[in-house]
UniProtKB/Swiss-Prot annotation:
Record's bilayer topology term: Multi-pass membrane protein
Protein name per Swiss-Prot or TrEMBL: Phosphatidylglycerol--prolipoprotein diacylglyceryl transferase
Chain ranges passing through the membrane: 24-44, 64-84, 100-120, 125-145, 187-207, 211-231, 247-267
Xref: InterPro entries: Lgt (IPR001640)
Pathway linked to the protein: Protein modification; lipoprotein biosynthesis (diacylglyceryl transfer)
Length: 291
C-alpha cells in the first residue's frame, strides 16, 4: 500500500487588511511585478553587463512599469477568453470583467507585454530589443510566483500519476486519484531553471547582443511549457486537441521557432558596440537622471 502526500490546506486569502482581502494569485502578481522591477533596475545600473551605459534609463523603466502591468493583466484575460473558453464568454460576456473568478493566460499576457514594449519604445525613442531583453529577464520571477499560487489555490493540477510516485498527491478538486503536482513542475522549469539560465547568460554578456535574452526566453519558456504539459491535466472545456496536443502545447510550438529565430538574428548581428539598432535618441536618454 502506497502512502500519498496529503495536499496541505491553505487559506484562500493571503492577506486581510480590514475589508480588503488579497488572494494568493493577486499577491503573486504584485510580488512578481515588484521583484521584477527591482531586478530590472539592478540590470540597468550595471554598465558592465551592457558594455557601457544601458540604452534605457532607470527613470524610463519606472515609467514603463505601469504600461506593462496593465498589458499583462489585460492581455492575460483576453488570451484566456479567446484561447481557452470563447464559447462561455460569448454567452456570458459580463464574466470577462470578473477577474476575481480566475482565468488568465500566460500566452495572452506575453502578447500584451510585447505590445507594451513596442508602443512604449516607439513613443520614447528606445530600442525595442533591449527593453524586451530586460522585460523577459525578469519574467521567470513572476512565472515562479504564479505557479506557486496555482498550487496553493489547488488549480491547474496534473494528470493522474502512478500511486508509487513519492510526490503524487490527491488534490481537493481533482477527484480521488493521485496526481502530478504539475504546478510545482512548472514553477521549477519556467521559474527557477529559466531564471538561472537567463541570469548566467546575462553574466556572460548576453545583454550586449540585443534580442539574445528575449529570444532565449521565448524559446526556453516554450520548451519548458511543452514538457510540463505532458504532466498537466488539460482544461476540462477543451481536453486534448489535434494529435493529443493541448492548447498550451499548440500556443508554445510557434514560440520555439520565433524564439530561435530571434536568437539567431541577435547572434548574427553582433554586440551593441557595432549594432545600429539603437535609436538616435537612446544615447541622449542614457544621460538623464538614472536614479
Amino acid at each position: 500500500m502506497f502512502l500519498l502526500i496529503t495536499y496541505p490546506v491553505f487559506d484562500p486569502v493571503a492577506i486581510s487588511l480590514g475589508p480588503i482581502a488579497i488572494r494568493w494569485y493577486a499577491l503573486a502578481y504584485i510580488g512578481g511585478i515588484m521583484l521584477g522591477w527591482l531586478y530590472a533596475r539592478a540590470l540597468l545600473r550595471s554598465e558592465k553587463l551592457w558594455g557601457g551605459p544601458a540604452p534605457i534609463s532607470v527613470v524610463q523603466l519606472d515609467d514603463f512599469i505601469l504600461w506593462v502591468t496593465i498589458a499583462i493583466i489585460v492581455g492575460g484575460r483576453v488570451g484566456y477568453v479567446l484561447f481557452y473558453n470563447p464559447d462561455y464568454f460569448i454567452r456570458y460576456p459580463a464574466q470577462i470583467f470578473q477577474l476575481w473568478n480566475g482565468g488568465m493566460s500566460f500566452h495572452g499576457g506575453f502578447m500584451g507585454c510585447v505590445a507594451a514594449v513596442i508602443l512604449f519604445c516607439r513613443r520614447h525613442g528606445l530600442p525595442i530589443l533591449s527593453l524586451g531583453d530586460v522585460a523577459t529577464a525578469v519574467g521567470p520571477i513572476g512565472l515562479f510566483l504564479g505557479r506557486i499560487a496555482n498550487f496553493i489555490n489547488s488549480e491547474l493540477w496534473g494528470r493522474p500519476a502512478d500511486p508509487g510516485l513519492p510526490w503524487a498527491m490527491v488534490f481537493p478538486n481533482g477527484g480521488p486519484l493521485p496526481r502530478h503536482p504539475s504546478q510545482l513542475y512548472e514553477a521549477a522549469l519556467e521559474g527557477i531553471l529559466l531564471f538561472t539560465i537567463l541570469a548566467l547568460m546575462i553574466r556572460l554578456g548576453a545583454l550586449k547582443r540585443p534580442g539574445l535574452v528575449l529570444g532565449s526566453f521565448i524559446a526556453l519558456y516554450a520548451m519548458a511549457r511543452i514538457v510540463a504539459e505532458f504532466f498537466r491535466e488539460p482544461d476540462p472545456q477543451l481536453g486534448f486537441l489535434w494529435g493529443g496536443l493541448t492548447m498550451g502545447m499548440l500556443l508554445s510550438i510557434p514560440m520555439v521557432i520565433i524564439g530561435l529565430a530571434i536568437v539567431y538574428a541577435a547572434w548574427s548581428r553582433g554586440s551593441r558596440a557595432s549594432d545600429a539598432q539603437a535609436s538616435p535618441n537612446s544615447g541622449a536618454s542614457t544621460k538623464v537622471d538614472r536614479d
